[in-house]
Amino acid sequence: MDLNIKKDLASNWFKLLQNAICDDIIKLEKNKLKFKSTTWKRNKDKDEGGGEYRIIKDGKIFEKVGVNFSKVHGKFPIQFQNKIPGASKDPRFWASGISVVMHMKNPRIPAMHFNTRYICTTQNWFGGGMDVTPSSKDINEKKKFHKTLKSMCDRHYKNYYKKYKKWCDEYFYLPHRNEARGIGGIFFDYKKKDFEKDFKFVRDVGVTFQMIFNDIIKRKIKKKWTLKDKEMQYIKRGRYTEFNLLYDRGTKFGLQTGGNVEGILMSLPPIAKWK
């Protein structure tokens, strides 16, 4: 398959998914809120692509939710070329992706994160994942979440869940705190063996995330909470902020490749606290 066709298939899917997820969010908010949409360009002087990020704040369900789509191309800075597969041979790249971060008003509903991407250098691969960060323990929620992920992964390859869960546990970890960011999920990168199979998996990850966030919110939206619960949520958001600014690959990649700063930092919670 021609590389340009692969790029179009991937970026068109990410854009379609952005629209579908935003539609779901609006429905959950009873059609009473609209997204604030911002389009951006990677380079003001020449065409290097860009994207669109959409944000809702202060909803009945979502305290802040961001849904970002991007499709960019250009050259990696010299200091970044040895860190990206294939970039040392040729610094030119093309990348497209979608990222979603949900911070909830009700602290009994966990924060949720999802992203998938397709990156092309002299090599081409998919990456992404999803994870959930509750501010209070819910063992049944954790079991249900991971059962859904395992079922999805098993549709493609029996080893995926074990491999990508382990990768997620290792990735979403704060070494300076010696603690996990949340209850895990799946994380994958450098999927490049078979475009059609990998793309099918990536699409399934997106659809499964849609199903998961709708299910969690609808089951927990009427759960009562206290000010103590909210304070715990703010503290947990502090940990979330630490991870995103210190360790997150997507944040580093975006900032070092001329991405839109507001779009990159949309993942940060509206309010966070530290003890």
Model-found features: residue ranges?
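Gly/Pro-rich turn-and-neighbor structural signature
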Residues: D2-P85, K191-L246
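Glycine-rich, often proline-containing surface loops adjacent to acidic residues and nearby aromatics
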Residues: W94-S96, W125-T133, E179-K193, Y240-E242
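Long, charged, mostly alpha-helical binding arms that flank functional sites
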Residues: M152-F201, I216-K218
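Compact, glycine/acidic-enriched structural inserts
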Residues: T122-K166
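Short conserved micro-motifs at the rims of enzyme active sites and ligand-binding pockets
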Residues: F80-N82, E141, K197, K252-G258
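Long, contiguous binding/interaction regions
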Residues: M104, T251-K275
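A generic structural motif
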Residues: K6, M104-N106, T122, V132-I139, ...
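Internal mixed beta-strand/loop scaffold within catalytic domains of large alpha/beta enzymes
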Residues: G51-G128
